[in-house]
């Protein structure tokens, strides 16, 4: 919200005390691709972080450091945007951040946060002093997703995302007739994919409406006493 023109600071990136900064660290994959939290990739965090890095660099001229595991810029124009940031001299350090502390050693580090990370591309442990740290937090299912799943009898994955009927042949349908999926309830989704899914789900709903009626499978549960203990 700090880079938003309608945000609390009018689009100016400022510290808590109102001061300006000259260095920012963006830590990718916080809560994603980790066996201790969420094993899956949250998919859209890389591009959101790159966009933020570009805006900070453009508006403040600060040194921006991206700490990443892998840059997953898979999408139309995404790789080109990544190359643009490299030309803007945004720093990219490949490696998991070990810790962020305020234990400074030199006078230049006073009042800053120290990011300790192993740069796997050069095999060196580095300590980067920054004034502000931004966490690219992974996506998780909504807190009330389980209630909705039970209400509409929707299958779900190990992580809690709603499951489609078939990943290729029926990507927005569910095993419950009349219920379709769209957006981040199925998994981490960016805006273009969510809009495309919403269109497909709306088309399925219109197909049901055009029929004028819905066929129900007349399944009836009953008890066979001879098989009961």
What is each PLM-predicted segment?
Residues 1-229:
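Residues forming the flavin
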């Amino acid at each position: 919200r700090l880079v938003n023109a309608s945000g609390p600071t009018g689009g100016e990136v400022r510290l808590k005390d109102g001061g300006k900064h000259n260095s920012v660290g963006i830590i990718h994959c916080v809560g994603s691709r980790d066996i201790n939290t969420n094993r899956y990739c949250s998919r859209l965090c890389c591009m959101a972080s790159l966009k933020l890095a570009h805006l900070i660099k453009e508006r403040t001229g600060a040194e921006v450091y991206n700490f990443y595991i892998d840059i997953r810029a898979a999408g139309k124009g995404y790789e080109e945007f990544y190359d643009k940031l490299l030309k803007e001299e945004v720093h990219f350090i490949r490696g998991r951040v070990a810790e962020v502390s305020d234990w400074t050693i030199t006078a230049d580090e006073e009042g800053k946060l120290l990011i300790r990370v192993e740069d796997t591309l050069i095999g060196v442990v580095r300590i980067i002093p920054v004034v502000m740290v931004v966490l690219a937090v992974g996506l998780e299912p909504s807190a009330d997703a389980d209630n909705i799943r039970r209400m509409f009898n929707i299958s779900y994955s190990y992580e809690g995302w709603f499951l489609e009927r078939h990943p290729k042949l029926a990507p927005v349908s569910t095993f419950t007739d009349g219920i379709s999926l769209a957006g981040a309830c199925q998994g981490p989704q960016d805006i273009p994919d969510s809009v495309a899914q919403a269109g497909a789900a709306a088309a399925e709903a219109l197909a049901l409406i055009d029929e004028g009626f819905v066929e129900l499978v007349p399944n009836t549960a009953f008890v066979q006493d001879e098989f009961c203990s």
